[in-house]
C-alpha cells in the first residue's frame, strides 16, 4: 500500500448527502475481486448516460475535475451495503482523500485499509471546502497528514483530527498484511520460544 504523507491536487465537489456504496460502485461491477479497473465504474450511474456516453453534467466528467485526487462530499458518505469495491473504485480513479462531515463506519475503516484518507470536518469547514472545490481547475487543496491540516487555494488552514493508529498506518503505507509483517521479528521470537517450551506441538 502506498504511503500517504501529503497530497496536493484538484478537489471535486459532490454536495450530495447519503451517497451509498451502490452509487459509488454499482452492483454490475462487483463480479471481480481485482482492485484495478474499477475506476471506470466509479459513480457509473451518474457518470454515464443509458447509451454509455458520458454525462457532461457530472462533476468528474468536467475537464477541470477529470484528474481530481480529493473528493469533498456531503454528509454520511459511503452508507449502505458493505462492499470493499467502493474504496477500490475511488482509488483506481485516482482519489486518495474524501472529506465529509461523516462516513458510514464500514466504508470509513475500509478506506484506511486501502490507502485512502477519509477526513471528518465540521459543517462550517465542509461548506468552506465545498466552495473551494467549486473553483474548477483552481480548486487545489493540500492535505498534510503529518500536521493534520488542509490548506485551501487561498492559503487558509483547516485542522482535522484522526486516530493515531490509523494515522500511523497511512503514513507508513501499512495495510493488514503490512501490520503483520511489521511485527515479524516478534512473531518469529514467539514461535521459537513456543516451539522450545512445547516441543510436542512443533
Curated annotation (Swiss-Prot):
GO CC term (a single one): 3-isopropylmalate dehydratase complex
Pathway(s) per entry: Amino-acid biosynthesis; L-leucine biosynthesis; L-leucine from 3-methyl-2-oxobutanoate: step 2/4
GO molecular function ontology, one term from the record: 3-isopropylmalate dehydratase activity
Gene3D superfamilies (UniProt xref): Aconitase, domain 4 (3.20.19.10)
UniProt-listed CDD domains: IPMI_Swivel
Pfam family, one: Aconitase_C
GO BP, one annotated term: L-leucine biosynthetic process
Sorted UniProt keywords: Amino-acid biosynthesis, Branched-chain amino acid biosynthesis, Leucine biosynthesis, Lyase
Protein family according to the UniProt entry: Belongs to the LeuD family. LeuD type 1 subfamily.
Summary of the function given for this chain in its UniProt record: Catalyzes the isomerization between 2-isopropylmalate and 3-isopropylmalate, via the formation of 2-isopropylmaleate.
Assembly and interaction partners: Heterodimer of LeuC and LeuD.
NCBIfam families cross-referenced by the UniProt entry: leuD, PRK01641.1
Protein name as annotated: 3-isopropylmalate dehydratase small subunit
Taxonomic path: Bacteria, Pseudomonadati, Pseudomonadota, Alphaproteobacteria, Hyphomicrobiales
Amino acid at each position: 500500500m502506498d504511503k500517504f504523507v501529503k497530497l496536493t491536487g484538484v478537489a471535486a465537489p459532490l454536495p450530495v448527502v447519503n451517497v451509498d456504496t451502490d452509487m459509488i460502485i454499482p452492483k454490475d461491477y462487483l463480479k471481480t475481486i481485482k482492485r484495478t479497473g474499477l475506476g471506470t465504474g466509479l459513480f457509473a450511474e451518474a457518470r454515464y448516460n443509458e447509451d454509455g456516453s458520458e454525462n457532461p453534467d457530472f462533476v468528474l466528467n468536467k475537464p477541470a475535475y477529470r484528474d481530481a485526487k480529493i473528493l469533498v462530499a456531503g454528509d454520511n458518505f459511503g452508507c449502505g451495503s458493505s462492499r470493499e469495491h467502493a474504496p477500490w473504485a475511488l482509488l483506481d480513479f485516482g482519489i486518495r482523500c474524501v472529506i465529509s462531515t461523516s462516513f458510514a463506519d464500514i466504508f470509513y475503516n475500509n478506506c484506511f485499509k486501502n490507502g485512502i484518507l477519509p477526513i471528518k470536518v465540521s459543517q462550517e469547514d465542509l461548506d468552506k471546502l465545498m466552495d473551494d472545490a467549486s473553483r474548477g481547475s483552481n480548486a487545489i487543496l493540500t492535505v498534510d497528514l503529518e500536521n493534520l491540516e488542509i490548506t485551501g487555494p487561498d492559503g487558509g488552514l483547516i485542522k482535522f483530527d484522526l486516530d493515531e493508529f490509523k494515522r500511523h498506518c497511512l503514513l507508513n503505507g501499512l495495510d493488514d498484511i503490512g501490520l503483520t509483517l511489521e511485527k515479524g521479528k516478534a512473531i518469529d521470537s514467539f514461535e521459537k520460544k513456543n516451539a522450545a517450551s512445547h516441543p510436542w506441538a512443533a
